[in-house]
Amino acid sequence: MKRLFGIVLSAFLLACSNPQEKAERLIDAMGETAQAGGDAVVDTSGWQQKWTVLQAAANSTDQDSLWARYQMISADIQASVPGGALYAIRTYFQVADSLPSRQEGALALFSAAVTFEEKLSDRGRAIQVLTMLVDRYPGTHMAETALAYRDVLVFENDESLLDKIHEWQTQESPPTP
């Protein structure tokens, strides 16, 4: 009986020390916080612990999809920390470069573009990354989304595109005969 208890206790302790289980519990907790009206990713308290758990899980998995999942979420956490945007972008690019023929690569590039625009206010680089996404993944749903977002970044300003066209037309009136 003592031996059976020891085996069960050992299995439980191993399960608790599994980095992937810790990461999944963390992701679930962050999701529950977000559903309850909180902002799990914006809450930067304990971000290093969260990042460490996700990186340990990413390093311990053999599956590309799980590795990408943990890396992307850890990058999201990095992006939420003041001064962490460039580290997040680096992580997104690592995923994109490591998985160039998978949808996770496209999602990573899109996330990098959003981070450039939202966190660093660098529309030029965001547009470059979106163009890279369209070139790497032509004809995909992510490419279509990237094109739409790129158009918003290119044409969006204080005035709408139609207002700009109207202003241009009124400034250059046709010559009178």
Question: What positions do the PLM features span?
Answer:
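Start-of-helix signal in alpha-solenoid helical-repeat scaffolds, especially tetratricopeptide repeats
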Residues: 23, 66-69, 89, 106, ...
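Short solvent-exposed coil/turn linkers within tandem alpha-helical repeat scaffolds
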Residues: 57-67, 96-105, 120, 134-147, ...
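C-terminal motif of bacterial Sec signal peptides marking the signal peptidase cleavage site
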Residues: 14-15
